[in-house]
Amino acid sequence: MAAKEVKFGREARERLLRGVDILANAVKVTLGPKGRNVVIDKSFGAPRITKDGVSVAKEIELEDKFENMGAQMLREVASKTNDIAGDGTTTATVLGQAIVQEGVKAVAAGMNPMDLKRGIDAAVDEVVANLFKKAKKIQTSAEIAQVGTISANGAAEIGKMIADAMEKVGNEGVITVEEAKTAETELEVVEGMQFDRGYLSPYFVTNAEKMVADLDDPYILIHEKKLSNLQSLLPVLEAVVQSGKPLLIIAEDVEGEALATLVVNKLRGGLKIAAVKAPGFGDRRKAMLEDIAILTSGQVISEDVGIKLENVTLDMLGRAKKVNISKENTTIIDGAGQKAEITARVNQIKAQIEETTSDYDREKLQERLAKLAGGVAVIRVGGATEVEVKEKKDRVDDALNATRAAVEEGIVAGGGTALLRAASALTVKGGNPDQEAGINIVRRALQAPARQIATNAGEEAAIIVGKVLENNADTYGYNTATGEFGDLIALGIVDPVKVVRSALQNAASIASLLITTEAMVAEMPKKDTPMPPMPAGGMGGMGGMDF
């Protein structure tokens, strides 16, 4: 076991604080509409330029083990806030640094760390309750656009695009962000249910120019297993031919004799048909086929439930107004499913999302939910260079997360103003002087985000904060982008409650742990042993050679 180095008391806390300061000072320059950029070196490719706090925090690793512990604990504040709210990482870092700095000073002055922690917790609880009380629910598309614009560092076109996407696919719909191949940023909305499987044979194409197969008012056969035997498929094919409607077959695979017969029938014009593979794999495939069945009012043909293919009748097939199939994707538009059944399925998936602990499973469940509930919107982020695209994509991701958080818990005045007001409204009393000191630590720390936003804009922070506090209106604050004071909610300078609340709660949680730290243990740095010197006379076996 490697030897360990141990630090105690004041020395331990000072080393922690040094690490906290290094990370926070690198992150906090990005805060606000006039925040600066941070350039991150990459071992290959161009350096990355970002104004995203958590991206900066994740890149910082310090040489000194004890300082690094402080930096990593503060990084946890940013990461946790990003996981919960998807934005507010820089605010959380600034709050965390402010609480730790004040707390370490208080402990050095002889105060009881545990009482300080109790005071900090009591103050944070009251501030969070105050934020919920002041929160304003957002209803309109314009308000959603405002939240997106603020989180995208003032880029109005990003805010508007996110508002448009949310309007089209609903709050339950999936909005994904991808890098575009062009310089333009654009929004694409896919209506209905789309899955990433295309036609099994190009002979199914109905529009040779676009290479797509369009089926109007088709029957949909949903089969769990492979289809290779033609005989079992014949009864259902004959029934569909007599109905005069097109047919879409969704199965694990269609091959051999069955596929050849379908293609021949399509080419002869006897049957308008297309076949695609079922989406997903394993249990997820079963669940997605069930989703398609509910959406189209059909049944999954599976021997597990005792239905054989040769016994299938037309009323077991799904229906939709239109199906569009390209080489890569199949889109089912306006399925004939019952609204009550679709709602029940949506609620079932929501319950699974609540229960799952896996991020991957949650993402896949949310995709399924969107396909059933509304649709999918894709924001393709473009730019002149790869570096610009990556930086812009970070901002779009932040803006998207912030708008979702705003819809969930409402909004408060932005620019750090809500926390400033909450500091003034703190009335909770501590049980002793040390707890009172903990409450005062939070009261002072709540000013830090507003001060940092002003500092990054080149303003005198104390003057700006003083002027804001002179006016008692809750929403009165400073618009850093224009340099004017006014009603921030009316000006569209807003923050989601979920973002502000998560930032404060996570900052206080980690800061309390750092303040109550009394000992630190780290591995001693390994001493590199020098290579032994080469023996005299060079390499063996070289004697007697003439040069």
From Swiss-Prot:
GO MF term (any one): ATP-dependent protein folding chaperone
Keyword set, alphabetical order: ATP-binding, Chaperone, Cytoplasm, Isomerase, Nucleotide-binding
GO biological process: protein refolding
Entry binding sites for ATP: T30, L31, G32, P33, K51, D87, G88, T89, T90, T91, G415, D495
Domain of life of the source: Bacteria
Pfam families linked: Cpn60_TCP1
EC number: 5.6.1.7
Localization (cell): Cytoplasm
Keyword Nucleotide-binding: yes
GO cellular component: cytoplasm
Cited InterPro entries: Chaperonin_Cpn60_CS (IPR018370), Cpn60/GroEL (IPR001844), Cpn60/GroEL/TCP-1 (IPR002423), GroEL-like_apical_dom_sf (IPR027409), GROEL-like_equatorial_sf (IPR027413), TCP-1-like_intermed_sf (IPR027410)
Catalytic activity of the protein: ATP + H2O + a folded polypeptide = ADP + phosphate + an unfolded polypeptide
EC class: isomerase
Record carries keyword Protein biosynthesis: no
Entry-linked HAMAP family: CH60 (MF_00600)
Complex and partners: Forms a cylinder of 14 subunits composed of two heptameric rings stacked back-to-back. Interacts with the co-chaperonin GroES.
Entry function: Together with its co-chaperonin GroES, plays an essential role in assisting protein folding. The GroEL-GroES system forms a nano-cage that allows encapsulation of the non-native substrate proteins and provides a physical environment optimized to promote and accelerate protein folding.
Assigned protein family: Belongs to the chaperonin (HSP60) family.
Protein name per its UniProtKB record: Chaperonin GroEL
Originating species: Bartonella tribocorum (strain CIP 105476 / IBS 506)
Source lineage: Bacteria, Pseudomonadati, Pseudomonadota, Alphaproteobacteria, Hyphomicrobiales
Gene that encodes it: groEL
